[in-house]
Amino acid sequence: MRRKVSIIGAGAVGATTAQYLAARNIADLVLVDIVENLPQGKALDLLEAGPVLGYDCQIVGSNSYDATAGSDVIVITSGSPRKPGMSRDDLLRVNMNIVRSVTEQAAPLSPDAVIIVVTNPLDAMCHVALEASGFPPARVVGQAGVLDAARFRAFVALELGVSPRDVHAMVLGGHGDTMVPLPRYTTVSGIPITQLIPADRIQAIVERTRDGGGEIVRLLGTSAFYAPAASVAEMVEAVLLDANRVLAASTYLTGQYGIHDLYVGVPIRLGAGGVKEIIEVELTDEERAALHRSANAVRELVQAMKQLT
């Protein structure tokens, strides 16, 4: 029996995620959106690309959550996109209500699913999905670190003129301005970038990574979608194939890194059933302090949500 992935939100990120997953041919796909005909049209367009691109998964679009029943993975992309001058935090009031509604409708129909949250502000929205679903924390995870690390890797590769496939990076913390890229754990074929790039250039790359989403917004007038969708597809594949991938993701911490009861980006082992292990890496005092500052920013958002409900 083929696996099933439901993507809630057929906008740019959701539809592109469906495109990338279809190309991998590892699951049947359902696109759901409140806009009439939008998910149906995009699903049909993707289905018709199958004979050319060589995939044969079923792809359907619907305005009803009933179509998602029995999903192995639910991807939540629904929400208001960032607009020029808008921080992720500005999205809080609008998107918390959207994510709560989506989760309350989708989760009961797929009680064994893994939920991957994409909606911003990401770490705060993971809390909403966790509470609304009633799922264990291991089965509610946020896509952030894969994207942030991908941006870091891309910028390092550009700096050195090497293939990004040879660059491996680690980014911790909340998905936003307070994220914590770790140059010490970033390597090119095993060589730390601290041995390859001057400190001032590393800092510039770190700052560009932190502003990665904002840079796209300023250029496009809306949020990125190719790289976020590719990052989601990688996480979905890890779950469906039980790949035990070591990836950074927004994960519910219960004391790891000295952080309690909070979603923050850290390295995890991701496979069937969601988060199999939270990996604690050794941090310097400065890195740990930066991670805690990032976590505090997330906690402030969570507290703000409580005031809004």
Curated annotation (Swiss-Prot):
Keywords: NAD, Oxidoreductase, Tricarboxylic acid cycle. It is an enzyme of class 1 (oxidoreductase). It catalyses: (S)-malate + NAD(+) = oxaloacetate + NADH + H(+). Pfam families: Ldh_1_C, Ldh_1_N. NAD(+) binds at residues 9-14, 33, 95, 118-120. Its EC number is 1.1.1.37. GO terms for molecular function: L-lactate dehydrogenase activity; L-malate dehydrogenase (NAD+) activity. The active site is at residue 175. GO terms for biological process: lactate metabolic process; tricarboxylic acid cycle. InterPro entries: L-lactate/malate_DH (IPR001557), Lactate/malate_DH_C (IPR022383), Lactate/malate_DH_N (IPR001236), Lactate_DH/Glyco_Ohase_4_C (IPR015955), Malate_DH_type3 (IPR011275), NAD(P)-bd_dom_sf (IPR036291). Substrate binds at residues 82, 88, 120, 151. HAMAP family: Malate_dehydrog_3 (MF_00487). Catalyzes the reversible oxidation of malate to oxaloacetate. Belongs to the LDH/MDH superfamily. MDH type 3 family. This is Malate dehydrogenase.
